[in-house]
């Protein structure tokens, strides 16, 4: 088995259905699909049971668990420990593959034998338009995590060893890839669009202050003598952004976000 696609969810039945349909529509079948549900009470478990026969008919191994957990990253770690495939991809509730043949196209490329992380591009969806983020362009500026987790595949052995640090609220993925990069794990870029996800309402987009504050921890700035100054700078630069955006008319907020993402098309 080559790929383990993992979805984590909690009380997000409608978003979950969207992701289930996307995975089920893949023309690539050398994979398993794992869903880790946090004990939902909105009918998500009944939905998962209804899809079991559909995945079986497609020839895709399908397993799910529904139990209380300690949050998103705990669920993602559980999924990794369940995985039997060579590569892990996290496609969480509401996320989708870009095309029905995404996995076929992606894995038709030559994967280097020493690559530990393989990643592609992402279609980001906003209220005001969509656009393709080509992550090759970000490699020089951000060699640690120049992609979103939906568009990358990590060796299962690495995920099971490193795991997500659950002390982070929203940047445990950044921390994990920082550790992988620091330890010399090889990244490989493939010029294919892998995933589509909503870039407007994600945790990082709506929590810029927490994003930067936790980022200081990742880079161990919190252990330096100048940490109070760095923290003050973060608060001065980012502390006002979300409150200000909340007070802005939506058209102005969208225009500002679009200006920062020039690849977005109406």
Q: Where are the model-predicted features located?
A:
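Nucleotide-sugar donor-binding/catalytic module of glycosyltransferases
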Residues: 1-205
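Solvent-exposed, non-transmembrane amphipathic alpha-helical segments
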Residues: 99, 174, 178-179, 214-217, ...
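Short alpha-helix boundary/capping motifs
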Residues: 187, 208, 243-247
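Catalytic core of nucleotide-sugar-dependent glycosyltransferases
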Residues: 193, 205-229
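Membrane-proximal basic amphipathic "stem/tether" segments
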Residues: 220-266
């Amino acid at each position: 088995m080559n790929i383990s696609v993992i979805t984590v969810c909690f009380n997000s039945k409608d978003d979950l259905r969207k992701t289930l349909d996307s995975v089920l529509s893949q023309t690539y079948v050398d994979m398993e699909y794992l869903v880790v549900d946090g004990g939902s009470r909105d009918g998500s478990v009944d939905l998962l049971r209804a899809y079991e026969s559909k995945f079986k008919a497609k020839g895709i191994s399908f397993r799910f668990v529904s139990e209380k957990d300690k949050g998103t990253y705990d669920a993602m770690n559980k999924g990794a420990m369940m995985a039997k495939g060579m590569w892990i991809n996290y496609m969480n509730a509401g996320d989708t593959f870009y095309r029905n043949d995404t996995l076929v196209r992606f894995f038709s490329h030559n994967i280097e034998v020493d690559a530990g992380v393989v990643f592609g591009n992402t279609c980001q969806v906003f209220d005001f338009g969509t656009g393709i983020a080509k992550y090759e362009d970000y490699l020089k500026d951000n060699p640690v995590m120049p992609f979103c987790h939906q568009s990358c595949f990590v060796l299962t052995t690495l995920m099971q060893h490193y795991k997500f640090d659950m002390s982070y609220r929203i940047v445990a993925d950044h921390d994990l890839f920082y550790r992988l990069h620091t330890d010399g794990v090889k990244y490989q870029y493939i010029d294919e669009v892998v995933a589509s996800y909503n870039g407007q309402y994600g945790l990082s987009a709506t929590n810029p202050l927490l994003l930067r504050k936790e980022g200081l921890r990742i880079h161990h700035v919190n252990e330096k003598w100048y940490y109070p100054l760095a923290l003050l700078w973060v608060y001065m630069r980012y502390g006002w952004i979300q409150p200000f955006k909340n007070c802005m008319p939506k058209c102005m907020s969208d225009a500002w976000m679009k200006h920062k993402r020039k690849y977005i098309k109406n």
